[in-house]
Amino acid sequence: MAKYTFVKFKINNDFFNWEKCFYAAQPIARKAGIVEIFHGKASDDSSSGACLFHVESQEKMEAFFKDMEKEVAASGHALESTEITCYEN
């Protein structure tokens, strides 16, 4: 069964600065079984971001965020704004 995670969040700096950090973390995410399908900003609000990931498991996604919390916060991702929804098919 395929598993996906949709993450919505606020960015407290420039989207493109956040995106540089996001790209830098991708090799680590892939090793954790997390593959980005999409990331972007809201058309009418560049401080609202979203990502869609294919994940091996929700537990691996949670562990990745816990391990990378400092880096995620440093990217401008406002941790307290994070909304995570899990899907499977």
Please state what every model-predicted region is.
Residues 71-75:
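Short, exposed beta-strand-loop hairpins at the edges of beta-sheets
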